[in-house]
Amino acid sequence: MGGKWSKSSVVGWPAVRERMRRAEPAADGVGAVSRDLEKHGAITSSNTAATNADCAWLEAQEEEEVGFPVTPQVPLRPMTYKAAVDLSHFLKEKGGLEGLIHSQRRQDILDLWIHHTQGYFPDWQNYTPGPGVRYPLTFGWCYKLVPVEPEKEEANKGENTSLLHPVSLHGMDDPEREVLEWRFDSRLAFHHMARELHPEYFKNC
């Protein structure tokens, strides 16, 4: 008799179960959806576009043309400590973020690309509030946001500069009106500055 769940079809289940058991935990500082993915292996009904800003944002991106598909080509999963460290070093080696002026749009593009290529739900790249240096809430992410010196901002003022370049926006994305740039700091892989400076963000972790 055997239906689709007969003994022969469950042969590989112990290996799958063991792999699930050994899955790395989500990194400290990730959002609610990543916590769902860690605990349940899926996004639960408590996190929908109506109840979670990250889900709503991701759903809205599916309507927009961003240059690549926004549906992940790999299984959806939470950002882990190891993945955050590895991704930080990968981007550093490729010269991707170091010294790049931060804007919400650029962060959104990065989040979508990582979501699409790696499957990490885009609720992990959050930072401490300003003014001053903004540290990543996700432990293992080695990029902080650092205010740009006025000299560097002034050097941007030329005829060939796009008015929509993030430096030209003079921090309009930022509540403190600071122009910020991504800066790699390898110490963030070992020292969770955000937890030290803002323990209130980690009460439910």
Curated annotation (Swiss-Prot):
Segments for region (Binding to ATP6V1H): 148-179
Sequence motif Diacidic, location on chain: 173-174
Cross-referenced InterPro entries: HIV-1_Nef_anchor_sf (IPR027480), HIV-1_Nef_core_sf (IPR027481), HIV_Nef (IPR001558)
Entry annotated with the keyword Membrane: yes
Residues spanned by motif Dileucine internalization motif: 163-164
Site keyed Might play a role in AP-1 recruitment to the Nef-MHC-I complex: positions: 20
Purpose of the protein: Factor of infectivity and pathogenicity, required for optimal virus replication. Alters numerous pathways of T-lymphocyte function and down-regulates immunity surface molecules in order to evade host defense and increase viral infectivity. Alters the functionality of other immunity cells, like dendritic cells, monocytes/macrophages and NK cells. In infected CD4(+) T-lymphocytes, down-regulates the surface MHC-I, mature MHC-II, CD4, CD28, CCR5 and CXCR4 molecules. Mediates internalization and degradation of host CD4 through the interaction of with the cytoplasmic tail of CD4, the recruitment of AP-2 (clathrin adapter protein complex 2), internalization through clathrin coated pits, and subsequent transport to endosomes and lysosomes for degradation. Diverts host MHC-I molecules to the trans-Golgi network-associated endosomal compartments by an endocytic pathway to finally target them for degradation.
Free-text note on domains in this protein's UniProt record: The N-terminal domain is composed of the N-myristoyl glycine and of a cluster of positively charged amino acids. It is required for inner plasma membrane targeting of Nef and virion incorporation, and thereby for infectivity. This domain is also involved in binding to TP53.
Name of the molecule in the record: Protein Nef
Organism in which the protein naturally occurs: Human immunodeficiency virus type 1 group M subtype B (isolate BH8)
